[in-house]
Amino acid sequence: MTAPTIAVRELSLRFGSRVIFDKLSFDIPAEQWISLLGASGAGKTSLLRIIAGLAAPTHGQVQASDGRPLAPRLAWMGQKDLLYPWLSVRDNVALGARLRGERVDRQRVARLLEQVGLSHCADDRPASLSGGMRQRAALARTLYEDRPIVLMDEPFSALDTLTRTRIQTLAAELLTQRTVVLITHDPMEACRLSHRLLVLSPPPGGIDDSHHLTGKPPRAPDDPALLRGQAALLQQLMRANG
C-alpha cells in the first residue's frame, strides 16, 4: 500500500461547554515522520484517536489525499506494549492475523523478529522480557501489519535513555516509506525522529507548525543542528503554554 498524505480540516472537539481544540487544519505529508507535542490535557491523544477513526470530532474531517478510507491502512503503537501474557513472542507478533482468522506468515514473523533482535526469544512469554525487549516485540507486531500509516502514542516514554535511543533508531529505520504520527513529550525525541513538528496549544487549542528541522532523521543525539532544534522547540513549547 502507498502511504497517503492526511488532510485535517476545520477539526473541533468539545466536551459539553469545554473546548479541547477548535478548527484545526493541517496536513500530514506522505512518508514522513510527524511529531505531535503539547502539554498534558491539550488533546494530543484525542486528536490521534480521531485521525485513527476511533473517536468522532465535534466538527471537521480527516481525509486521505487519495480519497480512500484511512482506517484499513492504519497501525497503532501505544505506550503500553499490550502483549498477551499467555502467548509467545512469536504469536504476539502475528496477533492481528490470528484475531482476523488469517493464515500466519511464519517466515515474515521470523524475519521481523530477526530485524528487531528477538529471534533468540521467539518462544518466550512476555513476562520474561525486559521493557525494551517488550517494546521491540510490539514494534515487530506493528510492522507485521504492514500498514502505510503508523500512529504512535508515546511508545518509548517508559524506557531508560539508552534503550529508548536504540529503539528510536530501530523504529526510524524500519518504518521508512510510511506516514508516521508520533505523540511525544520529549523535545529531543521529536527533533531526532521527525521531518516536521506540530505543537498543540492548551484548550482551546491551536496548531503551531512554525518549527523547521534540517537534516534527515534519525539524527545523531550529538548533532549540533538537533541540539539547536531541541532548544528552539523547548522555547516554542513554553510559549505555547503561556
Predicted regions and their residues:
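Conserved ABC transporter NBD signature motif
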Residues: 59-74
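The feature captures the beta-strand-to-loop junction immediately N-terminal to the Walker
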Residues: 37-39
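Conserved ABC ATPase "signature" region
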Residues: 104-121
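Conserved structural motif at the start of ABC-family nucleotide-binding domains
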Residues: 6-8, 20-23
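A short, proline-enriched helix->beta-strand linker immediately N-terminal to the Walker B motif
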Residues: 144-148
